């Protein structure tokens, strides 16, 4: 929470930084457990057995409208307020951090990205990239390339990690 407080403090200290904030998604692997924390609309996905699953939930107005049933998935894709973030670091003193815990299996791929990618590239296409290329550098480059080709209207950040289960060592 220190980073959140520092962003909040700087934004309040300097007038030109008023309204400054950021989203974040963090992934930590401890043994075979994946722990994720997120605020805002940066996302974490798990790719396993040729399937992709979004692990985080966006903190956005459109996500709230989807959850309440006021709009459909199709309407959400082009909603004029789809970029309104309801939670972010640095905007208000109180922030809601969501936590997710997942058991990993050998061969799983962890895919983190900013909204600059997830707003431009469909989950299905992310799945295809992860399935068609085995090297994480190539996967990341292809994902960024796809977002840029789709219009690249925002910063695009991607982090990819492959999980390999440790073999038990007998003593």
Task: State what each model feature region is.
Residues 1-171:
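PP2C/PPM-type serine/threonine phosphatase catalytic domain
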């Amino acid at each position: 929470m220190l980073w959140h407080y520092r962003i909040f403090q700087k934004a309040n200290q300097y007038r030109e930084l008023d309204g400054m904030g950021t989203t974040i998604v963090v992934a930590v692997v401890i043994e075979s457990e994946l722990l994720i924390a997120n605020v805002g609309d940066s996302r974490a996905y798990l790719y396993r057995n040729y399937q992709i699953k979004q692990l985080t939930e966006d903190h956005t107005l459109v996500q709230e409208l989807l959850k309440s049933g006021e709009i459909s998935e199709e309407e959400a894709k082009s909603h004029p307020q789809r970029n309104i973030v309801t939670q972010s670091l640095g905007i208000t003193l109180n922030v809601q951090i969501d936590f997710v815990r997942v058991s990993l299996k050998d061969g799983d791929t962890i895919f983190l990205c900013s909204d600059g990618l997830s707003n431009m590239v469909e989950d299905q296409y992310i799945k295809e990239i992860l399935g068609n290329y085995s090297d994480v550098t190539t996967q990341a480059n292809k994902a960024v390339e796809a977002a840029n080709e789709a219009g690249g209207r925002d910063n695009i950040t991607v982090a990819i990690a492959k999980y390999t289960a440790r073999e038990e060592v007998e003593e």
